């Protein structure tokens, strides 16, 4: 494995662990030239998951988009980034375990919202405000009322 810092091809593995619930192997490596450490992941090369957007366009699934959306929703909230990565990986795993190769962005958004609702109500409302694209304050207040009343349709 080539060192990302100095380009040297001589690196050694100093730690190996299962990652992503056993679907990947995480390796810590150290460059024998510059002594810097870096992490690599080994994963199965599986069929791609396609996301069908609201406008009908399609793109490859990207777990990182879920993670960055979670980060934005949870900004300045007492939630560990590792928990957000865990949620993104859980959603990815759930989607890949389905037999369908395509998933709608709507389904992904609902999966994120259901997990955020359990994790942190403020983060849930933040995410919902962007995801549901509230047209005005009243529609936003309706979502808050559902949350406060324990409504199932939120």
UniProtKB/Swiss-Prot annotation:
Cofactor details (free text): Binds 1 zinc ion.
Cofactor: Zn(2+)
Pfam families named in the record: ATP-cone (PF03477), Zn_ribbon_NrdR (PF22811)
ZnF (unnamed) intervals: 3-34
GO terms of molecular function: ATP binding; DNA binding; zinc ion binding
InterPro entries linked: ATP-cone_dom (IPR005144), NrdR-like_N (IPR055173), RNR_NrdR-like (IPR003796)
Keyword Repeat: no
GO terms under biological process: negative regulation of DNA-templated transcription
Alphabetical UniProt keywords: ATP-binding, DNA-binding, Metal-binding, Nucleotide-binding, Repressor, Transcription, Transcription regulation, Zinc, Zinc-finger
Record-annotated ATP-cone domain positions: 49-139
PANTHER family: TRANSCRIPTIONAL REPRESSOR NRDR
HAMAP family to which the protein is assigned, alphabetical: NrdR (MF_00440)
Family: Belongs to the NrdR family.
Entry protein name: Transcriptional repressor NrdR
